[in-house]
Curated annotation (Swiss-Prot):
GO biological process: DNA recombinase assembly; double-strand break repair; error-free postreplication DNA repair; heteroduplex formation; meiotic DNA recombinase assembly; positive regulation of single-strand break repair via homologous recombination; reciprocal meiotic recombination
Gene Ontology terms for molecular function: ATP binding; ATP-dependent activity, acting on DNA; ATP-dependent DNA damage sensor activity; DNA binding
Gene that encodes it: RAD55
Protein's name in the database: DNA repair protein RAD55
Miscellaneous notes: Present with 1050 molecules/cell in log phase SD medium.
Family per record: Belongs to the RecA family. RAD55 subfamily.
Pfam families: ATPase
């Protein structure tokens, strides 16, 4: 089978990038998802991978609506979860445009997917899909690897890893030929997996791992003593599976970018300062006359807001900032990964940007903080003079008697 791409297919005008609807992410991706490219989006269950794919479909349909003559179609490949078509019904009042331009197909085997793309490439002159989304691609790959491992009587990690790389190279080669012949964009939606999952002994997994009691079977702890000090990292299920190894770069070259979706917390500082007056009674004193009045200059109140983040992994070490037509190379991983904050807007049903509101902390550093590491109040407040005047705007003062021996 020929793996080459005719040069005439490359010397054409590039179509307009497909917007994700998240401004910060589009800026990193050079105005959006590029044509003739394959992207991987992975994340834990419930993070919104399918909703992200639906939003790409909606943005593509809106572009079709604006174009009077457009023969481009959208293909959604279902694996083990049906496409949420009801979201498109709510989004588009004229559902006819969805029925005419969005095609769905269900594939549950890795071999079926490979055969499907081989035939799709042969029919690329008659049927052209502008956008192809595969929801659950990693699950097809993992099931395929498990079947091969059981059929082979329990392959060693090196053998199954090399087999995984060869099969991914094969299917990504067919996908790449299709994207370059039609100018389409392929998005694969994958799960993520804990990197501690490395054993291929399916019958004895309980001896190595225990399920955390958090209501899900997602995070696990290692029971094996030699794995106790390992750091568990969430990675794409194409990488972290029973076929982990060091040669994943051989098939990652087919991906333009890898985007990880995770949850995070946005810290917001409330600048309201709470002032309290406290009287500390010495252990030798029997009355309140021996109490010393001190002022505590509170601790800033912090609120944590739940949100989502998208981490863009630049797999090929290319700097996003172009100098002319040349791409700059970067060896530092910190320079290659970009983080974008976003969340799901319930009002519009779309993913949106989050703008950080950073408070002015210029005066916060001048306030002394309260230390709780020592039981001696004289050591805690040794920098505060008891004869100072009360602070302005000291509303809601509170007097508390502390026994230094307590």
């Amino acid at each position: 089978m020929s793996l080459g791409i005719p040069l005439s297919q490359l010397i054409v005008e590039s179509p307009k990038p497909l917007s994700s609807g998240i401004t910060g992410l589009d800026e990193i991706l050079n105005l959006g998802f590029q044509a003739r490219s394959i992207y991987e989006i992975f994340g834990p269950p419930g993070i919104g991978k399918t909703n992200f794919g639906i939003q790409l479909v909606c943005n593509s349909l809106e572009g079709i609506q604006q174009s009077e003559i457009n023969d481009d179609k959208i293909l959604w490949i279902e694996t083990f979860q049906e496409m949420p078509i009801n979201i498109l019904r709510e989004r588009f009042q004229k559902f006819k445009i969805v029925e005419e331009n969005v095609k769905r197909v269900r594939i549950t085997k890795f071999g079926q997917l490979l055969y499907f793309f081989q035939n799709l490439f042969k029919l690329s002159q008659s049927v052209r899909y502008k956008l192809v989304i595969i929801d659950g691609f990693s699950q097809l790959v993992c099931d395929h690897l498990c079947t091969l491992s059981k059929r082979g009587g329990g392959m060693i990690d090196k053998t199954i890893h090399e087999l995984k790389c060869r099969h991914l190279i094969l299917i990504f080669t067919v996908m790449t030929k299709y994207t370059h012949s039609t100018g389409s964009t392929i998005i694969v939606l994958n799960d993520c997996m804990n990197t501690a999952f490395q054993s291929n002994e399916f019958e004895s997994l309980e001896e190595y791992y225990e399920i955390l009691d958090d209501g899900s079977n997602f995070f696990v702890n290692s029971n094996n003593e030699r794995r106790k000090n390992n750091v568990h990292i969430l990675k794409s299920a194409l990488v972290a599976n029973i076929a982990m190894g060091s040669k994943d770069s051989t098939w990652e070259v087919f991906l333009r970018d890898r985007i990880g979706l995770f949850r995070d917390w946005n810290e917001q500082v409330d600048e309201t300062v709470f002032v309290k007056s406290k009287r500390v009674k010495a252990s030798s004193s029997q009355s309140n006359e021996g109490c010393t009045t001190i002022k505590e200059m509170r601790i800033n109140k912090r609120n944590f807001e739940n949100l989502r983040i998208a981490i863009v992994f630049n797999l090929h070490g290319e700097d996003r900032k172009r100098e002319g037509r040349n791409l700059k190379r970067s060896r530092s991983s910190d320079d290659r990964n970009y983080i974008v904050k976003f969340d799901f807007d319930k009002a519009t049903g779309q993913l949106r940007d989050i703008i950080d509101l950073k408070p002015d902390t210029a005066n916060i550093a001048s306030f002394p903080t309260l230390s709780t590491s020592s039981s001696s109040c004289s050591q805690v407040f040794n920098n505060i003079d008891s004869n100072d005047n009360p602070l302005p705007n000291a509303e809601g003062k509170e007097e508390i008697i502390y026994d230094s021996e307590g």
